[in-house]
């Protein structure tokens, strides 16, 4: 699926994102409660001359989990080693990573929910006792070799917290769910990023981009980069609201942040006039269920455009109202009943 509002990280963006990445909590915009708590925990760990307890970040992609990991390492004065679960295929792969860590290092594992059970088993003793238990051989002749490793901080990131096994999840002393960003927070991020890219973005332009960025910094920065291209081709030194609007319209992103895939998803529900299961929607979109559930639906759910029910996905009353469609009778009655209880 090729979308300008795609949330997953695109390979060519890695270097681009690094140049715009904040290095401290003061530079990091948004996630205020998480930042506040982390500041306390980091200060306490440094005061005790200890490594920070293990941290788990979860939530939709593109909200800053990797950036927060880098900031934690920076605030702790530690080196950070980056890996991802799909790259750790064997116990030996994990052992090689852990034995090469230095005292106080931060190990960041992205997509940690994809670790195999065998890898998780090795990780348990490493997280709790800073020791590797390596089994040599098999059967009655098998032996366990214990290897001490430096004390370190594991930071795990996942978009699917429910897929992490309970034993692994319980070993993270700190667990934080990242929230979608407000338009004002995104507008500030966009203005700062535009300056770093050599373009001034007016307050109105930044807010226009923010409104169409689905509450996600990664999308906001991607849209900004494309709008900058339009501005440069037109020899414009700054990004105005009109430039932002026309560029976003050209990119097929409407004023609600919807692209063609979102509209197709919603159109499927409109046409069905009943609840649809995830597999049915995925088949209609020609996408896998994981992409629909992790990439398309989070924004629609968090903003109240769709609802999950026991029977499946349905359009919310808000969607019928936004798109000027008369809702089915049962939706109208449900809305009226909610209103009675809220009075």
UniProtKB/Swiss-Prot annotation:
Binding site for DNA: 308, 313
Catalytic activity: ATP + H2O = ADP + phosphate + H(+)
Start and end residues of each stretch annotated as Head domain (RuvB-H): 255-343
Chain positions recorded as ATP binding sites: 20-21, 62, 65-67, 128-130, 171, 181, 218
Localization terms from the record: Cytoplasm
Gene Ontology terms describing biological process: DNA recombination; DNA repair
Ligand binding (Mg(2+)): 66
Main location: cytoplasm
A Pfam family that the UniProt record links to this protein: RuvB_C
Keyword Cell inner membrane: no
GO terms for cellular component: cytoplasm; Holliday junction resolvase complex
Entry remark concerning the domains of this protein: Has 3 domains, the large (RuvB-L) and small ATPase (RuvB-S) domains and the C-terminal head (RuvB-H) domain. The head domain binds DNA, while the ATPase domains jointly bind ATP, ADP or are empty depending on the state of the subunit in the translocation cycle. During a single DNA translocation step the structure of each domain remains the same, but their relative positions change.
Family designation: Belongs to the RuvB family.
UniProt protein name: Holliday junction branch migration complex subunit RuvB
Taxonomic lineage of the native organism: Bacteria, Pseudomonadati, Campylobacterota, Epsilonproteobacteria, Campylobacterales
């Amino acid at each position: 699926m090729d979308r300008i509002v795609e949330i997953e990280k695109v390979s060519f963006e890695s270097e681009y994102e690094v140049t715009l990445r904040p290095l401290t909590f003061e530079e990091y915009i948004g996630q205020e409660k998480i930042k506040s708590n982390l500041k306390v925990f980091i200060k306490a760990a440094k005061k005790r001359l200890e490594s920070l307890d293990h941290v788990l970040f979860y939530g939709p992609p593109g909200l800053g989990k990797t950036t927060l990991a880098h900031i934690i390492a920076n605030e702790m004065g530690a080196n950070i080693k980056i890996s991802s679960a799909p790259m750790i295929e064997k116990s030996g792969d994990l052992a090689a990573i852990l034995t090469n860590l230095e005292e106080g290092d931060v190990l960041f594992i992205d997509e940690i929910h994809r670790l195999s059970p065998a890898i998780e088993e090795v990780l348990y003793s490493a997280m709790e006792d800073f020791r590797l238990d390596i089994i040599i051989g098999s059967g009655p002749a098998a032996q366990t070799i214990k290897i001490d490793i430096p004390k370190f901080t594991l930071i795990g990131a996942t978009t699917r917290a429910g897929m992490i096994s309970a034993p692994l999840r319980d070993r993270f002393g700190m667990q934080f769910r990242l929230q979608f960003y407000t338009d004002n927070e995104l507008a500030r991020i966009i203005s700062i990023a535009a300056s770093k890219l050599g373009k001034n973005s007016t307050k109105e332009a930044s807010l226009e981009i923010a409104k169409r960025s689905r509450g996600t910094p990664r999308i906001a920065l991607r849209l900004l980069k494309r709008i900058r291209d339009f501005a440069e081709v037109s020899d414009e030194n700054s990004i105005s609201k009109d430039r932002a609007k026309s560029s976003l319209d050209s990119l097929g992103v409407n004023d609600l942040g919807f692209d063609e895939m979102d509209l197709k998803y919603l159109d499927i529900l409109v046409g069905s006039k009943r609840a649809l299961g995830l597999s049915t929607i995925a088949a209609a979109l020609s996408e896998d269920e994981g992409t629909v559930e992790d990439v398309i639906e989070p924004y629609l759910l968090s903003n109240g455009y769709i609802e999950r029910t026991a029977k499946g996905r349905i359009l919310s009353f808000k969607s019928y109202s936004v798109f000027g469609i008369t809702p089915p009778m049962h939706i109208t009655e449900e809305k009226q009943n909610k209103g009675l209880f809220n009075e």
